[in-house]
Amino acid sequence: MGKYIKKSKVAGAVSVKDKSHPPALGFRTRAAAAKNLALHRLRSHSDEADSFNYLQLRSRRLVKLPLLTNTRKQQKQQLIPSVNQCQTKNPRASSGPAKKLEPDTTTEEACGDNERISRSDCNFGDKGFDLESENRSMISDSKSIQSEIEDFFASAEQQQQRFFIQKYNFDIVSDNPLPGRYEWVKVMP
């Protein structure tokens, strides 16, 4: 049995002792030692944990610097007012008829260079009506498309019916047996 057990080769072994608990009789397993070591590290780093955001993994702790999280929050807060300014330029929001707005440089400056929103994205006045008319034309086209599809598959269906009649002497359209090679018996369910 000794040939199947692999002995670990440890060059510099460091023993871990838990000073908070009195030594127990018997022996400690590796899992218990690792658990105690993790608790000890957690207690020793508790003062650091308050100042940083961190993610505790099994083998290590990932520390997120507060500087990065604060800058992301500030960027989001800066984007919210600029998006609101672009949304207020929407002519559909007003109760009057839709009319095209003149180019406004303050809107582009407020949206920023990275998040630049074109005037056509902020202006839905003329495009909204075009989309509705396109939708109506698509509905009328779908009826003609259905008839084209039926015409396309009609010849294939007729060919399949002829093949079935020749092979099995049964008309699947009218559900009637035909005289020929097979004798059909009606079964009552």
Curated annotation (Swiss-Prot):
Localization: Nucleus, Nucleoplasm
Cellular component aspect of the GO annotation: nucleoplasm
Domain of life: Eukaryota
GO molecular function term, any single one: cyclin-dependent protein serine/threonine kinase inhibitor activity
Polar residues bias: start-end ranges: 73-93
Keyword set, alphabetical order: Cell cycle, Nucleus, Protein kinase inhibitor
Gene Ontology terms: biological process: negative regulation of cyclin-dependent protein serine/threonine kinase activity; positive regulation of DNA endoreduplication
Record-annotated disulphide pairs: none
Region spans: Disordered: 73-107
UniProt keyword annotation of Protease present: no
Gene3D superfamilies on file: p27
Known tissue expression: Expressed in flowers and at lower levels in roots and leaves.
Pfam families xrefs: CDI
Known partners and oligomeric status: Interacts with CYCD4-1. Does not interact with CDKA-1.
Family in the record: Belongs to the CDI family. ICK/KRP subfamily.
Record function comment: Inhibits CYCD2-1/CDKA-1 complex kinase activity without interaction with the complex.
Protein name as it appears in the record: Cyclin-dependent kinase inhibitor 5
Organism: Arabidopsis thaliana (Mouse-ear cress)
